[in-house]
UniProtKB/Swiss-Prot annotation:
HAMAP family: UPF0178 (MF_00489). Pfam families: DUF188. This is UPF0178 protein Rsph17029_2512. Belongs to the UPF0178 family. It comes from Cereibacter sphaeroides (strain ATCC 17029 / ATH 2.4.9). It comes from the Bacteria.
């Protein structure tokens, strides 16, 4: 059975992910260390983990498997869940796979090195746009269909027709 895990701290697409999860009838876990509104739908569960570095990431990484989808911008978390067989969609609609996660990790490390070399560099990433939101919805829809098919294959087809 497919589950949808959301690395919910600072995730701009929680509502969109919930709509897709409900439409597909899959459980969705909003994982954070607090500060998010409890979900209204019974398929959506808030998981509050203790404060600390990467605690939410570890909770997700310990559970995500083949047939699951994870929404995160955290590249190290994405690498862990991709290795476990889960599909990853970033909030901007980019998908991370075994084919591109190595490049994503290398780029992340390079950018961290560049930022540390210039402590006076200001500014962050670009603002989150309607186009990003639209790309996310398209990518999540494709990932959910692919994950549900992978979940059926992994379980020997026992979920067919559900």
């Amino acid at each position: 059975m497919t589950d949808l895990y959301i690395d919910a701290d600072a995730c701009p697409v929680k509502a969109e992910a919930e709509r897709v999860a409900v439409r597909h009838g899959v459980r969705m876990f909003l994982v954070s260390n607090g500060g998010i509104r409890p979900p209204a739908h019974p398929l959506v569960e808030s998981i509050f983990v203790p404060e600390g570095p990467d605690v939410a990431d570890m909770w997700i990484a310990d559970r995500a498997r083949t047939g699951d989808v994870v929404v995160t911008s955290d590249i190290p978390l994405a690498a862990k869940v991709v290795a476990a067989g889960a599909l990853v969609v970033k909030p901007n609609g980019e998908t991370l796979t075994t084919a591109n996660i190595g490049n994503a990790l290398a780029t992340r490390d390079l950018m961290a090195d560049l930022r540390s070399a210039d402590p006076f560099r200001q500014g962050g990433g670009r603002t989150f746009s309607k186009a990003d939101r639209s790309r996310f919805l398209d990518a999540l829809e494709r990932a959910m269909r692919k994950a549900q098919e992978a979940g059926r294959s992994a379980s020997g087809g026992s979920e067919a027709g559900s």
